């Protein structure tokens, strides 16, 4: 499917595509199952959304920012800006992952979230 061929390199890291072919297959299936009108709507909504950095600047609570080392859509440099905008932020960069970190590296993401929550709320 040409839509998946275009989207996959922006969603998954090269490492994921090479070493975890099942992940790529699952994402391809999800893209194929998504109606074209929905994909179009999502693309327009993302293009029109306002900058969220002011929201982070105004938020008084703790923030966890998780980003894939090879995220082509929201690169680590943007994640760093998010973390810097927040009053209290933790930035976690997931090695060898792209934009879909919970799918590409679920154990790393789950550990980062559980440790972050435990440090703040236990």
Please identify what each model-predicted range represents.
Residues 7, 43, 82, 109, ...:
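Hydrophobic "lid"/C-terminal helical patch
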């Amino acid at each position: 499917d040409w839509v998946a061929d275009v989207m996959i390199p922006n969603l998954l890291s090269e490492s994921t595509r090479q070493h975890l072919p099942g992940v790529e297959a699952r994402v391809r299936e999800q893209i194929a199952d998504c109606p074209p009108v929905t994909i179009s709507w999502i693309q327009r909504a993302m293009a029109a959304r306002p900058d969220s950095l002011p929201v982070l600047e105004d938020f008084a609570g703790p923030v966890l920012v998780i980003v894939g080392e090879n995220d082509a859509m929201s690169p680590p440099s943007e994640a760093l800006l998010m973390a810097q905008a927040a009053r209290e932020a933790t930035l976690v960069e997931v090695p060898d992952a792209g934009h879909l970190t919970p799918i590409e590296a679920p154990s790393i993401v789950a550990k980062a979230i559980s440790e972050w929550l435990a440090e703040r709320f236990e």
